[in-house]
């Protein structure tokens, strides 16, 4: 602090050199150098090589000043002032810290306020968007409510309609059930009426009976006339005579040849086995023999008359039962003179097909039917023992029975008329086998055409042979049937 030249320089205290340490060094150096003058001795204050001006005690107590007079304040005073300045500095620092703490708190609050404002602004925007969304949702909710209300009211209407339809369906069900019962009763009453009419028809006008024949078996006759024929051959002939083709197979018929079936009387009958060879023989004989035939009991007349009556009966029964026949066959088909074998066979096949069709419609036991037994099948059809006679409704013809209906003699089917003047006209063709059987007679209001018996048809029934007794018989029978049928159906 003091120097001899008065040009001491103040240097800041180095680290580790505090006032106490400096005083201790000065005392030690003074004590050690008491009474010595060393050229290299340096002042502990100014660090210059000067003479010692103060004692160690003064240095230790801080009681020394500059000797050049520039500053009269002692070191100890400076030290006290320094401590006071430090205290003031600390106080100022505290005040500044206090002031800055308030500022810091203010800034923090400002930042908090700013952040809160920003958050509030964001929340406002979010709330605004939320309000818009809510408004849209509210509008959608109102629309959905209106739509739901409409759907609810519509559902109510549909429920009412459903209940109304259910009530209507119940009423219709009751009505249908009642109508079904009425229809069933009508069908039963109609079946009874049909049955009574058919039975009345077959009991008064067209009675069909079984007639026993007294003719001997040709096998027995041949065995008596031909002594060379063995017993095995006779048995084979007898077995062949009693065999008939039925439903695609050959079956034994015990009635074959022993009986015949008559219609309208015992004098008009058909062979039970469907053998019309007597008619064929008569036609061949008629071709060679000229002149009128005066024999009243000629088999050809009885066969043609029986087939004509059977045709009339089948057409009338089909009209009563309201059934369309699969084959078109006129009542006068068998009334012509000298029918060829081919034409007669074709007409008989149509008649048998119609009879079997009617038997299928009336649920006749098919085991009793044989395709070639015309009048026997017809007798089973109109028999009083037939349970389903007069029924209405759908039916089905078995395939094997259809095959049996189409069976004919191959020799007859392959023959051709040598005269060439016989052609199949449109009236002789089939009506068609593709017809669909309708389930109810309600849709079959149009009766079959062949049943319309007119006066012109009745005139066609009698053949042009005036001298033939069979022609007169058929003509009178046809006229009586026509008059009875007109009176029966009310067509006057």
Swiss-Prot record:
Keywords on record:
Autophagy, Coiled coil, Cytoplasm, Cytoplasmic vesicle, Endoplasmic reticulum, Membrane, Phosphoprotein, Ubl conjugation
How does this protein assemble? Forms homooligomers; homo-oligomerization is essential for the roles in membrane tethering and enhancement of SNARE-mediated fusion. Component of the PI3K (PI3KC3/PI3K-III/class III phosphatidylinositol 3-kinase) complex I (PI3KC3-C1) in which the core composed of the catalytic subunit PIK3C3, the regulatory subunit PIK3R4 and BECN1 is associated with ATG14. PI3KC3-C1 displays a V-shaped architecture with PIK3R4 serving as a bridge between PIK3C3 and the ATG14:BECN1 subcomplex. PI3KC3-C1 can associate with further regulatory subunits. Interacts with PIK3CB.
Look up and give the organism this protein is from: Mus musculus
Determine if Phosphoprotein is one of this entry's keywords.
yes
Tissue-specific expression: Widely expressed.
User: What conditions trigger expression of this protein?
Assistant: Expression is controlled by forkhead box O FoxO1 transcription factor and circadian rhythms.
GO MF annotations, alphabetized: GTPase binding; phosphatidylinositol 3-kinase inhibitor activity; protein-membrane adaptor activity
Spell out the Acidic residues composition-biased ranges: 424-433
Pfam families, per database record: ATG14
Q: How does it sit in the membrane?
A: Peripheral membrane protein
Name the gene behind this protein.
Atg14
Gene Ontology annotations of biological process type = autophagosome assembly; autophagosome maturation; autophagosome membrane docking; autophagy; cellular response to glucose starvation; defense response to virus; early endosome to late endosome transport; endosome to lysosome transport
Q: Which residues carry this modification: Phosphoserine?
A: 29, 416
In which compartments does the protein localize?
Cytoplasm; Endoplasmic reticulum membrane; Preautophagosomal structure membrane; Cytoplasmic vesicle, Autophagosome membrane
- What name goes with this protein? Beclin 1-associated autophagy-related key regulator
| Residue ranges that the Swiss-Prot or TrEMBL entry lists as coiled coil | 70-180
Q: Which GO terms describe its cellular component?
A: autophagosome membrane; axoneme; endoplasmic reticulum membrane; extrinsic component of omegasome membrane; extrinsic component of phagophore assembly site membrane; mitochondria-associated endoplasmic reticulum membrane contact site; phagocytic vesicle; phosphatidylinositol 3-kinase complex, class III
Region Disordered: start-end pairs: 410-439, 451-471
Q: What does this protein do?
A: Required for both basal and inducible autophagy. Determines the localization of the autophagy-specific PI3-kinase complex PI3KC3-C1. Plays a role in autophagosome formation and MAP1LC3/LC3 conjugation to phosphatidylethanolamine. Promotes BECN1 translocation from the trans-Golgi network to autophagosomes. Enhances PIK3C3 activity in a BECN1-dependent manner. Essential for the autophagy-dependent phosphorylation of BECN1. Stimulates the phosphorylation of BECN1, but suppresses the phosphorylation of PIK3C3 by AMPK.
Give the region (BATS) as residue ranges: 413-492
Q: How is the protein modified post-translationally, according to the record? A: Ubiquitinated via 'Lys-6', 'Lys-11' and 'Lys-63'-linked polyubiquitin chains on multiple lysines by MARCHF7, leading to ATG14 aggregation and loss of interaction with STX17.
Q: Which domain of life is it from?
A: Eukaryota
In which family does this protein belong, per the annotation? Belongs to the ATG14 family.
């Amino acid at each position: 602090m003091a120097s001899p030249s008065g040009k001491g320089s103040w240097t800041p205290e180095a680290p580790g050199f505090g006032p106490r340490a400096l005083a201790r060094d000065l005392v030690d150096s003074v004590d050690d150098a008491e009474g010595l003058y060393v050229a290299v001795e340096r002042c502990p204050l100014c660090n210059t090589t000067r003479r010692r001006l103060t004692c160690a005690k003064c240095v230790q107590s801080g009681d020394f000043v500059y000797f050049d007079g520039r500053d009269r304040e002692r070191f100890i005073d400076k030290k006290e002032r320094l401590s006071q300045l430090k205290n003031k500095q600390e106080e100022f620092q505290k005040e500044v810290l206090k002031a800055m703490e308030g500022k810091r708190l203010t800034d923090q609050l400002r930042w908090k306020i700013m952040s809160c404002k920003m958050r509030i602004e964001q929340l406002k925007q979010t709330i605004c968007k939320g309000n818009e969304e809510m408004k849209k949702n509210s509008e959608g909710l109102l629309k959905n409510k209106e739509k739901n209300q409409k759907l609810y009211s519509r559902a109510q209407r549909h429920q009412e309609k459903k209940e109304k339809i259910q009530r209507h369906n119940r009423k219709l069900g009751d009505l249908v059930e009642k109508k079904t019962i009425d229809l069933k009763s009508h069908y039963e009453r109609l079946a009874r009426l049909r049955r009574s009419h058919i039975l009345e028809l077959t009991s008064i006008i067209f009675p069909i009976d079984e007639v026993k024949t007294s003719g001997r078996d040709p096998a027995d006759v041949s065995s008596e006339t031909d002594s060379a024929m063995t017993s095995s051959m006779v048995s084979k002939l007898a077995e062949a005579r009693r065999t008939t083709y039925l439903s695609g197979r050959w079956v034994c018929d015990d009635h074959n040849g022993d009986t015949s079936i008559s219609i309208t009387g015992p004098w008009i009958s058909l062979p039970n086995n469907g053998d019309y060879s007597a008619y064929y023989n008569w036609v061949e004989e008629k071709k060679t023999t000229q002149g009128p035939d005066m024999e009243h009991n000629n088999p050809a007349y009885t066969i043609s008359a029986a087939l004509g009556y059977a045709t009339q009966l089948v057409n009338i029964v089909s009209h009563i039962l309201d059934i369309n026949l699969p084959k078109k066959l006129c009542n006068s088909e068998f009334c012509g003179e000298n029918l060829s074998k081919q034409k007669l066979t074709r007409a008989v096949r149509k008649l048998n097909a119609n009879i079997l069709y009617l038997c299928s419609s009336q649920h006749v036991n098919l085991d009793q039917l044989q395709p070639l037994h015309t009048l026997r099948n017809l007798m089973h059809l109109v028999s009083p023992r037939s349970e389903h006679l007069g029924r209405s409704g759908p039916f089905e013809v078995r395939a094997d029975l259809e095959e049996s209906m189409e069976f004919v003699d191959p020799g007859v089917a392959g023959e051709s008329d040598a005269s060439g003047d016989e052609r199949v006209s449109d009236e002789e063709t089939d009506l068609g086998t593709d017809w669909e059987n309708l389930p109810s007679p309600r849709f079959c209001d149009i009766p079959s055409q062949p049943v319309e018996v007119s006066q012109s048809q009745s005139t066609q029934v009698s053949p042009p042979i005036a001298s033939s007794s069979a022609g007169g018989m058929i003509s009178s029978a046809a006229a009586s049937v026509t008059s009875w049928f007109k009176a029966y159906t009310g067509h006057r």
